[in-house]
Amino acid sequence: MTLIKSISGIRGLIDKSLNPSMIARYAQAFSLVSPNHGKILLARDTRNSGKEYIKISISALERISRKSIVVDIVPTPTAQFEVFSKGYAGGIVFTASHNPSNWNGIKFIGPEAVSYTHLTLPTICSV
């Protein structure tokens, strides 16, 4: 059950190394390292698992009183632009880029539209 953690985010096999409980934990952990104001943007690529991951994230964020906004299917740069231009606290994008369809991944976006991963991944993964 491979889970790949790198500077570009987290990637894993759908429902195996990247399962619903992990998605919820990562969403909540990301919220904890994000600024306290503003919503967390949620986006995805065209993989079907992204729909479920967004629902899981909404629920997980609501449990800790964090609001989210869903932009659904958009490229990562569009999600980054939305985070920055709308003043959101950050963003979570479910995408696995070039990986096979049985994979998905998570990219974390900071409030200034840049990848948050190099700063936050150790904290997020320790939760």
Can you say where each PLM-predicted feature lies in the sequence?
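N-terminal small/polar loop signature for handling phosphorylated ligands or for N-terminal nucleophile
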Residues: 40-103
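An N-terminal, well-structured beta->alpha segment
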Residues: 1-64
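Generic structural "secondary-structure junction" signal
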Residues: 12-16, 76, 108-111
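Conserved small/polar residues in nucleotide/adenosyl-binding loops
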Residues: 117-122
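A residue-level detector for conformationally permissive "hinge/kink" positions
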Residues: 1-4, 35, 83, 97, ...
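Acidic/polar active-site rim loop that often engages polyanionic ligands
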Residues: 99-114
